[in-house]
């Protein structure tokens, strides 16, 4: 049976009763975390303190994994800084990017958590990343005794389903150019932070096709500037 792999040096937050975290770094973690979860469901300070009591900070260097395929997913978390990428590896070794996790985004492979089976996905840091994580079992126990966190879990699940449906529509109902435009609007500046091949795999196209789309966009922008100057 696969087991969870966690760094042994991690410590939980000390503000069990709602006292402020001990360091400025921890204060910023808590601030970003609170903003992220409150964007999904209204939560009081006491609710935030409850969940911070079961979380611990984790730092990942670029290229370090939060989760590898074959491991058992057992943690949930929120990205407080940096960038994560979730992807699958095909039999030929090709990577297919499923999602990006920016600051404020929830992280953890929900499907693998629910199934209890070895993970099919990898989650890797694309740049130095800091996250707050909690054991999935602890989060379930908190939801059992807290109506506020149970509602949060329900709303998060609904949000994940909506995002999944939107992603399916993009891949099945939109052409590559439209997908690229939507990606650029949703993730401004992200292209400069990750390799082009990862953006291409997220869009379901080749890196060569992505290069063509970028070139067309540059030409269109240049033509627009020319028309504006002439008007």
What is each residue range found by the language model?
Residues 2-56:
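Cyclic nucleotide-binding regulatory module and flanking cytosolic helices
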Residues 33, 160-169:
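Short, Lys/Arg-enriched N-terminal segment that forms or immediately precedes the first helix
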Residues 39-46, 76, 130, 167-173, ...:
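Localized chelating/binding microdomains
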Residues 63, 74-87, 103-104:
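Glycine- and acidic-residue-biased ligand/ion/polar-headgroup-sensing regions
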Residues 66-71:
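Short phosphate-coordinating micro-motif centered on Lys-Gly-acidic
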Residues 87-93:
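Cytochrome P450 core scaffold surrounding the K-helix E-X-X-R motif
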Residues 97-154:
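Cyclic-nucleotide recognition modules
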Residues 174-231:
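Phosphate-/nucleic-acid-contacting segments
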């Amino acid at each position: 049976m696969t087991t969870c792999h966690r760094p042994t040096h991690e410590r939980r937050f000390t503000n069990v009763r709602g006292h402020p975290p001990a360091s400025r770094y921890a204060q910023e973690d808590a601030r970003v975390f609170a903003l992220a979860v409150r964007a999904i469901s209204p939560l009081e300070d006491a609710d935030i303190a409850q969940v911070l009591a079961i979380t611990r900070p984790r730092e990942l260097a670029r290229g370090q994994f939060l989760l590898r395929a074959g491991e058992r997913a057992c943690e949930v978390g929120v990205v407080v800084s940096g960038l994560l990428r979730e992807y699958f590896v095909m039999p030929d070794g090709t990577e297919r990017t499923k999602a990006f996790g920016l600051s404020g985004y929830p992280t953890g492979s929900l499907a693998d958590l629910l199934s209890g089976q070895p993970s099919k996905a990898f989650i890797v840091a694309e740049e130095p990343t800091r996250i707050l994580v909690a054991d999935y079992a602890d989060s379930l126990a908190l939801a059992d005794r807290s109506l506020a966190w149970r509602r949060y879990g329900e709303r998060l699940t609904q949000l994940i389903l909506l995002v999944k449906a939107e992603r399916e529509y993009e891949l099945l109902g939109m052409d590559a150019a439209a997908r690229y435009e939507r990606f650029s609007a949703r993730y401004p500046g992200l292209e400069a932070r990750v390799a082009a091949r990862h953006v291409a795999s997220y869009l379901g196209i080749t890196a060569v096709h992505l290069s063509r789309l970028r070139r067309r966009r540059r030409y269109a922008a240049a033509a627009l500037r020319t028309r504006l100057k002439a008007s």
